[in-house]
Curated annotation (Swiss-Prot):
Residues that hold Mg(2+) 2 according to the record: 99, 249
Physiological role: Part of the phosphoribosylformylglycinamidine synthase complex involved in the purines biosynthetic pathway. Catalyzes the ATP-dependent conversion of formylglycinamide ribonucleotide (FGAR) and glutamine to yield formylglycinamidine ribonucleotide (FGAM) and glutamate. The FGAM synthase complex is composed of three subunits. PurQ produces an ammonia molecule by converting glutamine to glutamate. PurL transfers the ammonia molecule to FGAR to form FGAM in an ATP-dependent manner.
Single GO term (MF): phosphoribosylformylglycinamidine synthase activity
Protein name: Phosphoribosylformylglycinamidine synthase subunit PurL
Signal peptide: none
Enzyme Commission number, as recorded: 6.3.5.3
Gene: purL
Length: 713
């Protein structure tokens, strides 16, 4: 997006002159929403970024796991994936891996959080197949397993899919790359040759999608996972030899962003030669400085360590160029073929203006709070519609394309539990639980409550695996910040996250914002969305829990069920409504219930644990009892619900469903305060109310297994 007149005026006043072509390109890249956070920065400061166990924020959040550091981050590649699903998604994977690598951590796992449009649309099928193939090919080839994720389908994302990828890495505590660059330190660009792919990609990501968007293919980068693998190996070796002071991925904004942000962060300047960089093709100076060619990293190296670093890079056949050094001037000075082509204050370029944009709730949004009287439904038909919804049904078609076994760390695999569980090979038998969640309907209907609900679902997923949640990162997707009625959603989502993270003492330690997720063809924005990736500590991976049951297990429901159908899958699948208020977030209750669950998991005889969320109790029972069937007694469900639909499909939080051996039930009930609401076995999924059968679904497993796949292939 071009600079505004006000921004151009500010630049000219600060420089005392008009910027040249190279400098203009640098400002356009760095001052884009994608790089500068100029609209969101004010509100992001509300988030609690620190805790005693948080070591570092920034490109990759780093958390102290006792014996090792764990780095993690989430980032989107929305606009590129809408235009070119395969390459857009693949390069998103590469970028997030390099962010983790920049801290010195070895990337050990990927997760994806994907939101697509109406699955009956051919455009959406193209998006799904391309995105999944891109993630699969890149992750599989680079040797990092994809261990979990979340996938949603909603008509408002038909032209604008949301594609986010999270990565987790592990670093020995004495090898974290977090040194302080100083004047004289060398700037080395390592990795792929720089080309014209990805030119001004950050600017592309900071505007609406338009008709004829094929013209934006130049902003889509080309992935090279084999070079990424060489970068991983070479940087980890240089890390081990302590040759790296600081490392930064050349992502959005390219050299313009990397040079200015690192210099500004440490109060330094830069002097660099653009013509020293290894190029794929002849390029002008402005193209070099804002190219976003992939698989490139900026290494800060002491002069005395350069020769040893060069030997490592040459060992792995990683191309590199020494393009300059840091100075004490506080200015970014660039040369091209002997001519000075840029001379800018680093801090001014890196930070840019901070905007205080107006925001207000759209008037039409108030009407959505009202939930009309719902007609009675056949409960069996309702269960079938909910279980066959692509939002509830199995995502096996997706995760079976991913290699989730490489690196031999994965304990709880995709489809097995609420969170992925990874071995800490560096400190057995400890492990990491990681989950990612989103719910665009919730954040659309009430962005504050909805954001908190999404956060708390990720919290429950981590707890259900047997882990104690430690930290989270967020990806926030919204429409244009220039429109007050759309920016309001973003502000309220951040307010919800800032509130809930403090209530449960799980800090949000990093994240990413993506604006302009709307298109000029329909004039519509997406449903504003929060994606949360949360990690937790598992004391013993051999005790990690899966969402499973065995024949004869009792079903114990922990937590109260409220009549909360607003924004539910039931409301959409059965009544085609997206209305009402999402479930009330109850963080203090969540924390209390979580402690009970973590105690109950230690009881011998607990077969499996599953949180109750999308699709309500009906979906939770069906998912837990696959292979056996189950009987659910609604009158045993605690809470102020009145209609059977509310007991079956309410998506109230702070609830877990446990599969428990009969002989362990008494102890589990004592620890959790839960109630026995059913039993596993018998074949179909049966629902009783006061002893009378009100629904029986024989084909529930087929609905779960094929609800998404049958519409996709």
């Amino acid at each position: 997006m071009p600079l505004t007149e006000e921004e151009l005026k500010l630049i000219e006043e600060t420089l005392g002159r008009k910027p040249n072509q190279v400098e203009l390109a640098m400002f356009e890249a760095q001052w884009s929403e994608h790089c500068s956070y100029k609209s969101s920065r004010k509100h992001l400061r509300k988030l609690k970024m620190d805790s005693p166990w948080v070591v570092k924020g920034g490109d990759a959040a780093v958390v102290d796991f006792g014996s090792v550091y764990v780095a993690f981050r989430i980032e989107s590649h929305n606009h590129p994936s809408a235009v070119d699903p395969y390459n857009g998604a693949a390069t998103g994977v590469g970028g997030i891996i390099r962010d983790i690598l920049s801290s010195g951590a070895k990337p050990i796992a990927l997760l994806d959080d994907l939101i697509f449009g109406d699955l009956d649309e051919n455009l959406v099928k193209w998006h799904v197949k391309g995105v999944v193939k891109g993630i699969s090919d890149y992750g599989n080839r680079v040797g990092v397993p994809t261990v979990g994720g979340e996938t949603w389908f909603d008509p408002d994302f038909t032209r604008n899919p949301m594609v986010s990828v999270a990565c987790v890495g592990v670093c020995p505590k004495d090898k974290l790359i977090n040194g302080t660059p100083r004047p004289g330190d060398l700037i080395v660009i390592a990795g792929n040759y720089t080309g014209k792919d990805g030119l001004l990609g950050s600017s592309f990501a900071s505007k609406n999608l338009e008709e004829g968007v094929e013209e934006e293919y130049a902003a889509i980068q080309v992935p090279d996972p084999l070079m990424e693998k060489l970068l991983i190996d070479s940087i980890l070796e240089m890390r081990d030899e302590r040759l790296l002071v600081f490392v930064k991925d050349l992502g959005g904004g390219g050299l313009a962003t990397a040079l200015s942000e690192v210099a500004a962060s440490f109060g330094l300047g830069v002097e660099a030669r653009l013509d020293a960089l290894h190029l794929r093709e002849p390029m002008e100076a402005w193209e070099i400085v804002v190219s976003e060619s992939q698989e490139r990293m900026m290494l800060v190296i002491r002069p005395e360590d350069l020769e040893r670093a060069k030997k490592v890079l040459e060992k792995y056949d990683v191309p590199y160029s020494v393009i300059g050094k840091f100075t004490d001037t506080g200015r970014v000075v660039l040369y091209y073929n002997g001519e000075k082509v840029a001379d800018l204050p680093a801090k001014f370029l890196a930070e840019g203006p901070e905007l205080d944009r107006p925001y207000e709730r759209p008037k039409w949004h108030l009407e959505l709070e009202l939930l009309p009287p719902l007609p009675e439904v056949d409960l069996g038909d309702a269960i079938r519609k909910v279980l066959s919804s692509p939002n509830v049904a199995s995502k096996r078609w997706i995760y079976e394309q991913y290699d989730h076994e490489v690196q031999i760390r994965t304990v709880v695999k995709p489809g097995e539990g609420d969170a992925a569980v990874l071995r800490l090979l560096e400190d057995p038998p400890k492990g990491i639980a990681v989950a990612t969640d989103s719910n665009p309907r919730y954040t659309f209907l009430d962005p504050l409550w909805g954001a908190a609900d999404v956060f708390l679902e990720a919290y429950r997923n981590v707890v259900a695996s047997g882990a104690r949640p430690l930290a989270a990162v967020d990806q926030v997707d919204a429409g244009s910040p220039e429109r007050p009625d759309r920016f309001w959603f973003f502000v309220r989502m951040i307010d919800g996250l800032a509130w809930v993270e403090r209530e449960v003492d799980v800090p949000i330690v990093g994240g990413k914002v993506s604006f302009y997720n709307e298109d000029d063809v329909t004039g519509k924005q997406i449903k504003p969305t929060v994606m949360i990736t949360m990690i937790g500590k598992v004391e013993n991976v051999y005790n990690a829990k899966r969402a499973r049951a065995e024949e004869g297990d009792l079903l114990v429901l922990v937590g109260e069920t409220f009549p909360e159908l607003g924004g539910s899958e039931f409301l959409w699948s059965v009544h085609k409504l997206v209305r009402g208020k999402p479930p009330v977030p109850r963080p203090s209750t969540e924390a209390r219930v979580a402690e009970r669950i973590l105690k109950a998991i230690k009881v011998s005889g607990v077969t499996g644990v599953h949180d109750v969320s999308v699709g309500g109790l009906a979906a939770a029972v069906a998912e837990l009892a696959k292979g056996f069937g189950a009987t659910l007694e609604l009158d045993k469900v605690k809470g102020p619900w009145k209609r059977p639909e509310e007991a079956l499909f309410s998506e109230s939080g702070a609830r877990y469903l446990l599969a428990v051996k009969p002989e362990a039930a008494e102890e589990v009930l004592k620890v959790t305060g839960g109630t026995v609401v059913g039993k596993v076995g018998g074949g179909p999924l049966r629902v009783l109310l006061n002893g009378k059968e009100v629904a029986s679904v024989d084909d529930f497993e087929d609905l779960l297994e094929n609800g998404m796949t049958s519409r996709l292939v």
